[in-house]
C-alpha cells in the first residue's frame, strides 16, 4: 500500500473511532492503523539476512507521530500526548516484529496490539496529567483503556505482516513468466 492509502486509512480511523463505541467507550482505531503500518514496513524493509534496516522504524515512528498530531488537532486538546504515544506505537510495532518475534503467529498480533493499546492510553493520560491542569478519575481511565485494548484484539488477530521486498519481486516475476 502506498503512503497516501495509509494516510487515508488513518484519517478514516480517526473519523470513525468517536462514532463507533462499545458500552459508550470509543474505539482506539488509530493505534491499530499505526500498528499495521509498523509491522508491514518492518517486513518490507527487511534485508536478505532477515533483519530490517533502521528506516522501517524511522518511517513507522514518523507515520505514528503524524497520526498522533492529526488526532491531537482533531480533538482540540493539547498537542503532544498523541504524537508521543502514536510515535512510540509505530516504533515498537516495527521493532517487535523485526527483532523480538521472528515467527509470526496471529495470536501474537492480538496480544501485542492489546498491549500497545494499553501503553497508548497510559502515555496519553500520563502526558495530559503531567502537562495540563486536568483531573481525571482513575477508575474511569482504567476502564476505558482496558475496554479499548480488548476491543483491539480482534483487529490484531487479522493484521498480518507484509512480504519482504525480494519475495514480492520473485512472486511477481514468476507470475509474469506464466502469463
Task: For the regions a language model picked out, list residue spans one by one.
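Terminal, non-globular segments
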Residues: 1-179
Amino acid at each position: 500500500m502506498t503512503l497516501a492509502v495509509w494516510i487515508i486509512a488513518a484519517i478514516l480511523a480517526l473519523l470513525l473511532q468517536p462514532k463507533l463505541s462499545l458500552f459508550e467507550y470509543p474505539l482506539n482505531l488509530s493505534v491499530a492503523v499505526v500498528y499495521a503500518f509498523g509491522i508491514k514496513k518492518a517486513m518490507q524493509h527487511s534485508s536478505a539476512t532477515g533483519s530490517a534496516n533502521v528506516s522501517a522504524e524511522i518511517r513507522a515512528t514518523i507515520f505514528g507521530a503524524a497520526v498522533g498530531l492529526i488526532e491531537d488537532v482533531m480533538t482540540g486538546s493539547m498537542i503532544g500526548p498523541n504524537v508521543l504515544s502514536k510515535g512510540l506505537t509505530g516504533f515498537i510495532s516495527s521493532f517487535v516484529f523485526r527483532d523480538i518475534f521472528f515467527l509470526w503467529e496471529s495470536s501474537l498480533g492480538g496480544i501485542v496490539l492489546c498491549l500497545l493499546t494499553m501503553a497508548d492510553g497510559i502515555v496519553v493520560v500520563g502526558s495530559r496529567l503531567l502537562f495540563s491542569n486536568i483531573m481525571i478519575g482513575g477508575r474511569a481511565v482504567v476502564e476505558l483503556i482496558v475496554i479499548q485494548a480488548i476491543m483491539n484484539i480482534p483487529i490484531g488477530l487479522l493484521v498480518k505482516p507484509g512480504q519482504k521486498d525480494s519475495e514480492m519481486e520473485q512472486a511477481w516475476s514468476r507470475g509474469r513468466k506464466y502469463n
